[in-house]
Amino acid sequence: MKFKGYLIRESEGNFNGSIEDIDIPKLEQGRVLIKVHYSSLNYKDALAASGAKGVASSYPFVPGIDVAGEIIESSTPDFSVGDNVIATGYKIGMSEFGGFGEIVHLPSNWVIKMPSELDHIKCMSFGTAGITAAACIKKIVDGDCSKKLPVLVSGSTGGVGSISVGILSKIGYEVHAISGKSSQIDTLKMMGANKILDRNEYMSDPIKPMDKAQYSAAVDTVGGDILSKMLTMIANHGVVSCCGN
């Protein structure tokens, strides 16, 4: 039996992908076979497809670090055939064939049952970027950061940044979004940003050891000087959630 997958092959330092027929693996103890309904496209998937070192462990390889689907075979009592599930992170799309194929064969402890409030496509609409944004925002919420001051988001047109803007706005924060893309101003406002800060203007003044406390919290997806400046502008007992490579 075979399934179709987007297989990346390497030849003399060149990496190329195509849809190929791949053998369905025999179910191993402690693992499950999942029929993939949806995946999502992440930066790490592009790295794997282009042969970036430290991502895929070997080639040929199927990328796709996010999976939403249903169990078609299980070797563990934790899952039954027909269960709707999600898998993300761990080594999916790195040392294990990922979600850009019809079937994945994963350790059962990498898999969770899909919440009944969601469906496969909704889960993958958020994907790894959404999970990362949610983890950042949970730290802000757990820190009981005041809503009297705005929150700051860097990299706001990227996956994590844009979802952070939307969630923070939805839960009642005033959101200031840093962006270098003037063409995306209307999109950011639509997602909930109250103020757009041009990245070059934001960085135009020298970074001080301590600046005026302007924000109760921040989500940073960029690092470097942007993060350095951000840290000087956070009020006492504030939270800065950082993520990225």
List where the protein language model places each region.
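Short, well-ordered loop/turn sites that connect or cap secondary structure elements
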Residues: 78-79, 145, 234
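Glycine-rich phosphate-binding loop and adjacent beta-alpha segment
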Residues: 222-245
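Short amphipathic alpha-helix with an adjacent loop that forms part of the alpha/beta core around
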Residues: 202-213
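N-terminal Rossmann-like NAD(P) cofactor-binding module of classical short-chain dehydrogenase/reductase
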Residues: 86, 216-219, 241
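Short glycine-centered segments of the SAM/dcSAM-binding site in methyltransferase folds
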Residues: 84, 150, 238-239
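Mid-domain Rossmann-like dinucleotide-binding core that forms the NAD(H)/NADP(H) cofactor-binding site
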Residues: 124-201
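Glycine-rich beta-strand-centered segment in the early N-terminal region that forms part
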Residues: 23-41, 52-92, 98
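Short glycine/proline-centered loop/turn elements that form peptide/ligand docking sites
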Residues: 74, 94, 177-187, 224-226
